[in-house]
Amino acid sequence: MKLIEHFLSIQGEGAYAGRLAIFVRFGGCNLRCAGFGVHLKAPNAKELIGCDTIKAAQCENFDFKDTNFSELKNIIKSHNAPNAIIVLSGGEPLLHQKNTDFKDFLRFLVEQNRQVHFESNGTIEPDFNTLPELKNCYFALSVKLENSGESKEKRINARALKSIFANSKGAFYKFVLSGESDEIREIKEILAIQNGGVWLMPLGASKNELEITAAKVAGLAIKHGFNYSDRIHIRLWDNKEGV
């Protein structure tokens, strides 16, 4: 289980934007999302293309170390932020739900009465029976659309979405849009599978890129009765990592 980074910041997007948060980012993802068009040259000289967390999603191309429960517990304590929510991100953090250290970490957080938020792509069904602590968690579901470059079969798991909304403490959708009208049609198709609150966010990994799509996406949110979420961390710190 690779630990990519951890940091204390504010939640930059979605229903809990602005909340003080400890982010713990794990490596590994079951999607590549080349359609988002972020390019990066890895230390092994491989040219990568994917999303704005490409190092986490394609961590096999980087020299990240394995982590364990003891280290993760100490990380939370080191930030000395008892009122912060805990955001488990990636990559796709649910890839690790069968890992013993991950399970121990989640149990520790729940026992400490921490508010735990998963940032997930919604394609993996949480094992609420084997790991009941997942029922105490919130899920921000960034279900991918056609603009991700992934096939519909890979990016939409109806059973997983239904299970998350039925069993978790809370869940909502957040969609990254370029501002095209077809994206709204796709969102409505997903809501027909499993309804839920929706936050629309502009596509972009930098302030300049956000400026291109933000107004158009906000207009779509207003027109179709959805919520709009800016991406505060990008507005404040541009494409800087670890914030």
Language-model-detected regions and their locations in the chain:
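A secondary-structure boundary/capping signal
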Residues: R25, S89-G90
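Glycine-rich, highly charged phosphate/nucleotide-binding loops
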Residues: F64-N74
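Conserved AdoMet/S-adenosylmethionine-binding subsite of the radical SAM
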Residues: K73, P82-A84, L94-V243
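N-terminal [4Fe-4S]-dependent radical SAM core
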Residues: M1-D66, H79, I234, N239-V243
